[in-house]
Amino acid sequence: MFQDNPLLAQLKQQLHSQTPRAEGVVKATEKGFGFLEVDAQKSYFIPPPQMKKVMHGDRIVAVIHTEKERESAEPEELIEPFLTRFVGKVQGKNDRLSIVPDHPLLKDAIPCRAARGVQHEFKEGDWAVAEMRRHPLKGDRSFYADLTQYITFADDHFVPWWVTLARHNLEKEAPNGVATEMLDEGLERQDLTALNFVTIDSASTEDMDDALYAEELADGRLQLTVAIADPTAWIAEGSKLDNAAKIRAFTNYLPGFNIPMLPRELSDDLCSLRANEVRPALACRMIISADGTIDDDIAFFAATIESKAKLAYDNVSDWLENNGTWQPDNEGIAQQIRLLHRICLSRSEWRHHHALVFKDRPDYRFVLGEKGEVLDIVAEPRRIANRIVEESMIAANLCAARVLRDKLGFGIYNVHTGFDPANADALAALLKTHGLHVDAEEVLTLEGFCKLRRELDAQPSGFLDSRIRRFQSFAEISTEPGPHFGLGLEAYATWTSPIRKYGDMINHRLLKAVIKGEAIARPQEDITQQMAERRRLNRMAERDVGDWLYARFLNDKAGTNTRFAAEIIDVSRGGMRVRLVDNGAIAFIPAPFLHAVHDELVCSQENGTVQIKGETVYKVTDVIDVTIAEVRMETRSIIARPAA
């Protein structure tokens, strides 16, 4: 009798509309209960039984109940699940399989089975890719997943690499394909094979992109010719190889090995500017005045070159610093190193005054054994030879940016607009509290940004610099010419790494059109989006593999008194993040390790400081001594504590 009662339906509807609800993101805890985080200020308690319906990270709508003045959330509707495609470890065997997602806050095993078409017979400990199929808030009884791809077995030494690449859905190997002959591009190539071009790279590099040649002109000015490997002489636009490179967008450099954008036959051989091998190249010739200014008379042209020496950064740096036993093979090579050194110094001086120069940070290199074990982690400081190459590449990219802008009006540009205009007033207010006065309007211009950066670089510590970083915008890839505030340049377009960056291949094709005086279409916007997305994924993959290897490397230091110098890089409510100076590992120091009495401790992310009893004890950029308290292998996290 009540079934179709309109009054009852109306009452139900009324009750439903009067019940308070909230939308937010589920945050799990290790204790079984959770919270519905609505915004930074408001969250609701989710009791353990209700947590069984949801997963950490799910965006949901929940009904809010109030009992004895305590509010709690009952999940009602799923807006967006946290897990869709994920990687994890398989448990059980045969017909009763489950998978534990590889995520620090997801501990529960999810029942699963192999998807149709997946041949592998899964067993305990296998790593797999899975896709969620059922969710309790979707009307299903429980969570359920399909195993869509086998990654590797439990004890594979190379788990960090294979699991990370599968997690980010990235390629595991070089693309297939061969280039049999060079294309007829209708380009006249200048024969520069007699000139003493040299390459300077790491000793182990095989994919040499760039070769340099310098000479002194009669009036004392220096002429630099930058010759760049020419993969577009082999790869036609729209071909199979070109499309594969477009998808990859970059060579993926991971600790221990790389996954190239082009087939290795091209990247490490046919295109690589190997010593004593004749190679096609795209070249740029520029004249540099004594004060480091690049003259307007810039020439781009196609060439044939033959590198006369494969030089290594450390050898060249040692020789210039009068250290070590290494000597150039002959006076011609020695003369090249001297001239390139002079160009480096004058360009560096010019950039100090007219643009911006990054502070040098060391590169950290993992030394790996046959089985992927970490034998050592070496900090490699950026030395004078690195800077010679860097200054030459920045100069060449600046030339390309100008030529593409003036001749075509488009290209693949790296654009960085400095500070987000919405943050300008807050930035000026923050700087004022530290005694620096800037105009909120002026700081949004390239000149104003450079002026502020130089003032910050002159500060005794990097503390203030670290505080304003959150106000900065991100660098972008754009087809429209625009300034690069981070480099302090009016425009910047890279073309010097076409073996490893697809955007540089595009700029090669555009520059060749300029050389031939031909019209060419503007690159599609979706290409810049693909490049930005791939750059993000490659960086995450490099970080993930690094975290795994750091955890392996420091595992035997946990609980010992071994001290490490560590720079504080971030403060949050829960503690501090530090970077170990000698090897680059990131570790977390929980707040209770900083001070035992909770009420006397204030960790402020806003100020980048830790105060104990009102006194600032730690701040971002401080370097302190720490010991390793614990290494959690399952989450690849390193927990440190200040050394006693």
UniProtKB/Swiss-Prot annotation:
InterPro entries registered for this protein in UniProt: CSD, NA-bd_OB-fold, RNase_B_OB_dom, RNase_II, RNase_II/R, RNase_II/R_CS, RNase_II/RNase_R, RNR_Ribonuclease
Domain S1 motif per the UniProt entry, residue ranges: 561-643
Top-level class of the enzyme under EC nomenclature: hydrolase
EC number assigned by the record: 3.1.13.1
Domain RNB residue range list: 189-516
Catalysed reaction, written as an equation: Exonucleolytic cleavage in the 3'- to 5'-direction to yield nucleoside 5'-phosphates
Key words of the record: Cytoplasm, Exonuclease, Hydrolase, Nuclease, RNA-binding
Subcellular location: Cytoplasm
Superkingdom assignment: Bacteria
CC terms in the record's Gene Ontology section: cytosol
A Gene Ontology biological process term: mRNA catabolic process
GO molecular function, one term: exoribonuclease II activity
NCBIfam families the record matches: 3_prime_RNase (TIGR00358), PRK05054.1 (NF003455), RNase_B (TIGR02062)
Function noted in UniProt: Involved in mRNA degradation. Hydrolyzes single-stranded polyribonucleotides processively in the 3' to 5' direction.
The family this protein is said to belong to: Belongs to the RNR ribonuclease family. RNase II subfamily.
Protein name: Exoribonuclease 2
Gene that encodes the chain: rnb
